[in-house]
């Protein structure tokens, strides 16, 4: 079910998730972990129009958990933390039906 996802940035994870295809509509797991649910402060959905790019975002103290149940999205990550072992590392991670999972 998908592509290999190699991540170079320390602290970033790709957690493979399951999806169940059904002719009536597919089912996508997002999480079964109690600690994931307990720590949620905000949940929102976003769309990206085909061929468009959404702006770079810089988060200093935020952990995001991203899932792409419809379509395919390429996330480009850069480690700008000067005190990080992976300082200046860059990752391109593609998430979608062929590589379904949660990016943390």
Where do the protein language model's features map onto the residues?
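Short, intrinsically disordered, charge-balanced linker/junction segments flanking boundaries
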Residues: 100-104
């Amino acid at each position: 079910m998908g592509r290999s996802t190699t991540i170079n940035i320390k602290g970033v994870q790709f957690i493979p998730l399951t999806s169940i295809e059904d002719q009536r509509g597919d089912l996508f797991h997002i999480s079964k972990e109690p600690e994931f649910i307990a720590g949620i402060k905000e949940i929102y959905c976003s769309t990206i129009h085909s061929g468009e790019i959404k702006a770079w975002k810089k988060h200093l103290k935020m952990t995001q958990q991203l899932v792409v149940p419809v379509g395919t999205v390429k996330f480009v990550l850069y480690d700008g933390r000067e005190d990080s072992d992976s300082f200046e590392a860059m990752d391109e991670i593609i998430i979608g039906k062929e590589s379904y999972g949660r990016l943390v």
